[in-house]
Amino acid sequence: MGKRKKSTRKPTKRLVQKLDTKFNCLFCNHEKSVSCTLDKKNSIGTLSCKICGQSFQTRINSLSQPVDVYSDWFDAVEEVNSGRGSDTDDGDEGSDSDYESDSEQDAKTQNDGEIDSDEEEVDSDEERIGQVKRGRGALVDSDDE
């Protein structure tokens, strides 16, 4: 006798996990308080926090999702916090960075109204060369003797 034929299994539908559209605020730390809207017509993604009122806008493309706008916001906040976002170096004056040298400050205090010893030597060399060219001190005796 023959075996009973097994029925074929139907393929299972894949569950597509939707990405979040509500996020945690980076400033006030409230959960799911940041909502994201995508304006694909104008290519602008906007985030805004309902609690603290913080907002952010960035350019998007046709494939962008709300999580992309949130990640851009996260990167921008990190960039500002690390100091790379500012154009001025005002915050660097009081810090003790490994890359700063104290010799720059020493040079500034020395050059305030004082002449550097190297500059004095250059001035005396220029005067000596100028005297030779003007004929005050002849290097070679003339042939007229």
From Swiss-Prot:
The keyword Acetylation does not apply. InterPro entries: Elf1, T_Elf1_sf. Residues 80-145 are annotated as: Disordered. Pfam families: Zn_ribbon_Elf1 (PF05129). It is found in: Nucleus. Residues 88-104, 113-126 have a biased composition (Acidic residues). This is Transcription elongation factor 1.
